Amino acid sequence: MLELLVSASLTVNSDRPGKLKPSRADADVWTLSDREGITTSARSVSQLFARPCPRVPPGQPPSAMAAYSQTQYSAGIQQATPYTAYPPPAQAYGIPSYSIKTEDSLNHSPGQSGFLSYGSSFSTPASGQSPYTYQMHGTAGIYQGANGLTNAAGFGTVHQDYPSYPGFPQSQYSQYYSSSYNPPYVPASSICPSPLSTSTYVLQEASHNIPSQSSESLGGEYNTHNGPSTPAKEGDTDRPPRASDGKLRGRSKRSSDPSPAGDNEIERVFVWDLDETIIIFHSLLTGTFASRYGKDTTASVRIGLMMEEMIFNLADTHLFFNDLEDCDQIHVDDVSSDDNGQDLSTYNFSADGFHSSAPGANLCLGSGVHGGVDWMRKLAFRYRRVKEMYNTYKNNVGGLIGAPKRETWLQLRAELEALTDLWLTHSLKALNLINSRPNCVNVLVTTTQLIPALAKVLLYGLGSVFPIENIYSATKTGKESCFERIMQRFGRKAVYIVIGDGVEEEQGAKKHNMPFWRISCHADLEALRHALELEYL
């Protein structure tokens, strides 16, 4: 009879848990005990009903309630012992350390949103190398303590600006680079109009970049290089001097190094042919250009002959072509190692006995090694003077040839542009685009002898885009050999693009896996300029 009453009472109370009251249950049980005389088992039944009750008696303080999002454990499950908290390793740049999700965290209460949640603001501003504060899953104490993570409320009240994060001084890394190190980053002012609040690297312009100078200021200097190559670092001064053609030279007695600095920092090298690519010259003399484009053949030949006369007149009068015709060099610095640095301001080239000291017609064999040390020094003097004249008058050839010839030259240039439909103008647009880039360079390889090639460059107004160090003559060795020297000079990391109209440069480019851009008409020049403007090349 007792068992039936107890089970009936359990059934009724389980169906209506909200109506369960401990005082009424106790009264029913004590009434039952009065009738049957059982008291001990009735107290255990009262405890059984009172244990799963979720309600809190009125007298119990609110602190006895479980904290929000705190893990609840059933009566039969023992709470797992918290794992030992280990401090995170030192973070080099303020990256927060992440804890591993443990097995007991899988039994989280439904009120917890996930493994990692964020608060309304950082409890304390991040300082030094400290990791940021996050609220981890399980706030009962498993992930607290030495791990540096604190409970924070959600984002949204205090906006943390990026400048509040600490900057990292670069002084601690001074042992890894010299004081002259210039990080190759773009200045912040050129990227956005408003100044950035964070610390940024600013590329400071090197003090030894040669600005645009007047032609008179470069008259007495030997080491004058206005090319687009990158300035050298201070640490490079102790290295062996490297000639501008890419070959290592022994130390001469000159105080200045003729080689342009920073050749191995060039990223892209444009190797140009001269005749029928940049300028129209040979096809004027033969009449090929006039017949192809329907021009006056007589006028074409006349203009070609007049330009040829001016070229050789300039070469003979100012560039020692009479002395150097049989001693032609591939590059202007090929004999610079024989120069002792003597002052040439009062040197008399016509009376130094250059011809008489070199017997026979074959003054030069190979690359010019003949005639003894004294004769080689006089040869080097002439090439040094040629270099000085080129650098002085490359933007003012009219001042070199004189006023009467200057007028003739200007008239001839105008007629040439009209006959060739502005061929040279289109070429100069592409050349100037390349020349304006900081890490790109124009290099000229021509089958003309070096001295007449320099005269052509000056008379056609190309001196500003071709430094004399970037001009090579392939008369003796061929263009493929010149390509190898150029690659040795600028390094294998640079990208080489060959631009020309002939088979020789195309085959040389193919052998060295260089892209080749053929120039055969005005449309090719326009397409090249368009590709450069869009930075496809």
Curated annotation (Swiss-Prot):
A Gene Ontology cellular-component term: cytoplasm
Q: Where is the composition biased (Polar residues)?
A: 210-229
| Reaction catalyzed | O-phospho-L-tyrosyl-[protein] + H2O = L-tyrosyl-[protein] + phosphate
GO annotation (BP), single: positive regulation of DNA repair
Query: Which cysteine pairs make disulfide bonds?
Result: none
Q: What is the lineage of its organism?
A: Eukaryota, Metazoa, Chordata, Craniata, Vertebrata
The job of this chain, per UniProt, is described as:
Functions both as protein phosphatase and as transcriptional coactivator for SIX1, and probably also for SIX2, SIX4 and SIX5. Tyrosine phosphatase that dephosphorylates 'Tyr-142' of histone H2AX (H2AXY142ph) and promotes efficient DNA repair via the recruitment of DNA repair complexes containing MDC1. 'Tyr-142' phosphorylation of histone H2AX plays a central role in DNA repair and acts as a mark that distinguishes between apoptotic and repair responses to genotoxic stress. Its function as histone phosphatase may contribute to its function in transcription regulation during organogenesis.
- Its chief place of residence is cytoplasm
The record's section on Gene3D superfamilies has:
3.40.50.12350
Comp. bias regions, Basic and acidic residues: 233-248
Which Enzyme Commission number(s) are listed? 3.1.3.48
- MF terms (GO), sorted A to Z: histone H2AXY142 phosphatase activity; magnesium ion binding; protein tyrosine phosphatase activity
The cofactors it requires, by name, are:
Mg(2+)
The name this protein carries in UniProt is: Protein phosphatase EYA2
UniProt: Mg(2+) binding residues? 273, 275, 501
Source organism per UniProt: Bos taurus
From the UniProt entry, list the residue stretches annotated as the region Disordered. 210-262
Where in or outside the cell it occurs: the entry states:
Cytoplasm; Nucleus
Q: Which UniProt keywords apply?
A: Activator, Chromatin regulator, Cytoplasm, Developmental protein, DNA damage, DNA repair, Hydrolase, Magnesium, Metal-binding, Nucleus, Protein phosphatase, Transcription, Transcription regulation
What InterPro entries does UniProt report for this protein, alphabetically? Answer: EYA, EYA_dom, EYA_dom_metazoan, EYA_dom_sf, HAD-like_sf
The entry's family comment says: Belongs to the HAD-like hydrolase superfamily. EYA family.
What does the record's cofactor remark say about binding?
Binds 1 Mg(2+) ion per subunit.
Active-site residues, as the UniProt record annotates them: 273 (nucleophile), 275 (proton donor)
Per the UniProt record, one Pfam family is Hydrolase
Q: Which PANTHER family match?
A: EYES ABSENT, EYES ABSENT HOMOLOG 2
Q: Note the subunit structure.
A: Interacts with DACH2 and SIX1, and probably with SIX2, SIX4 and SIX5. Interacts with CAPN8. Interacts with GNAZ and GNAI2; this precludes interaction with SIX1.
From which domain of life does this come?
Answer: Eukaryota
